[in-house]
Amino acid sequence: MKTLLLTLVVLTIVCLDLGYTMTCYNQQLSQPQTTTTCAESFCYKKTWSGTIIERGCGCPPMKPPIRLKCCRTEKCNN
């Protein structure tokens, strides 16, 4: 009985993927829309003079004149 219970617990953990992942856009400039699955809990969008120059996972440090917008919801960096 204990073996069956342990097997069910392990199977549940493997199937549910307890590590949370997030989906962020990662296309550059005018490329077609693409997404990536991220382990980080942020997505970001870099802009320069009003033009989006980079998208991705995380929230990297940035210095002016490049602007950085970080967000915490699925596909929020479009």
Swiss-Prot record:
Disulfide bonds join 24-43, 38-57, 59-70, 71-76. The keyword S-adenosyl-L-methionine does not apply. It is found in: Secreted. Residues 1-21 form the signal peptide. GO terms for cellular component: extracellular region. It comes from the Eukaryota. Pfam families: Toxin_cobra-type. Keywords: Acetylcholine receptor inhibiting toxin, Disulfide bond, Ion channel impairing toxin, Neurotoxin, Postsynaptic neurotoxin, Secreted, Signal, Toxin. CDD domains: TFP_snake_toxin. GO terms for molecular function: acetylcholine receptor inhibitor activity; ion channel regulator activity; toxin activity. Expressed by the venom gland. InterPro entries: Snake_3FTx, Snake_toxin-like_sf, Snake_toxin_con_site, Toxin_cobra-type. Belongs to the three-finger toxin family. Short-chain subfamily. Type I alpha-neurotoxin sub-subfamily. Binds to muscle nicotinic acetylcholine receptor (nAChR) and inhibit acetylcholine from binding to the receptor, thereby impairing neuromuscular transmission. This is Short neurotoxin 342. The lineage of its organism: Eukaryota, Metazoa, Chordata, Craniata, Vertebrata.
